[in-house]
């Protein structure tokens, strides 16, 4: 049993009920973020508090929701196009692991160019992402604080990672108010994933 270790964490963690209200302060003045989420969260009304807070702070934003569980390359390329079209300069990943991973990979393509397939594996991302803030609404993935994102190959069903310290979010907002309404089954499975 080793009693010594090093631990480095570059993500600023904001925690507590209602902490979503601190989102504008984590973004640069005048930022224009792309919010990456999924249709289920839009339907559940969980995107509304985020857009309202940004709007109240006078920030313009764009929303991208073409995200599926076990995301594929088209989810990333579509998001990168949305980021460019809306002239965004920051990214917010809102949801479970899939939206947060897609947000990371959109940032990779937006700053490094090409296709996400070019960055599968470790150490292939050369340029840092735009400011990325992740807001998890489930309990299990940990994507909001890690240097990993996972892309699924639909032909083989194999999941390939993008691994780089450059994709670690600058901040994570852990607001229990956003996860309290999770369906019991989803809360249970993602909670067990965390354990």
Feature-to-residue mapping (PLM):
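Conserved functional loop/turn residues at catalytic and ligand-binding sites
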Residues: 58, 87, 95-98, 136
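Short Gly/Thr/Asp-enriched flexible loops that form oxyanion-binding sites at enzyme active sites
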Residues: 50, 80, 99-112, 145-146
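ATP/NTP phosphate-donor binding region
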Residues: 1-90
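A glycine/threonine-rich phosphate-anchoring loop and its flanking beta-alpha core
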Residues: 11, 21, 111-194
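Glycine- (often His-adjacent) and acidic-residue-rich active-site loop
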Residues: 56, 68, 108-117
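Short beta-strand/turn micro-motifs composed of small residues
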Residues: 37, 95, 152
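FAD-binding core of FAD-dependent oxidoreductases
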Residues: 92-104, 138-141
């Amino acid at each position: 049993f080793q009693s010594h270790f090093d631990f480095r964490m570059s993500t600023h963690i904001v925690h507590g009920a209602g902490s979503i209200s601190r989102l504008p302060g984590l973004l640069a003045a005048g930022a224009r973020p792309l919010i990456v989420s999924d249709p289920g969260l839009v339907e559940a009304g969980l995107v509304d508090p985020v857009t309202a807070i940004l709007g109240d702070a006078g920030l313009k934003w764009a929303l991208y929701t073409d995200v599926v569980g076990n995301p594929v390359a088209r989810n990333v390329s579509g998001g990168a196009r949305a980021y460019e079209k809306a002239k965004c300069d920051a990214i917010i990943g809102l949801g479970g692991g899939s939206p947060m991973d897609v947000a990371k990979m959109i940032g990779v393509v937006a700053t490094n160019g090409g296709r996400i397939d070019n960055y599968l594996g470790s150490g292939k991302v050369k340029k840092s992402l735009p400011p990325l803030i992740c807001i998890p609404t489930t309990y299990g993935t940990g994507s909001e604080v890690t240097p990993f994102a996972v892309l699924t190959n639909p032909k083989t069903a194999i999941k390939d990672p993008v691994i780089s310290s450059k994709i670690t979010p600058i901040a994570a907002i852990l607001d229990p108010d956003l996860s309290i309404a999770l369906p019991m089954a989803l809360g249970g499975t993602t909670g067990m994933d965390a354990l």
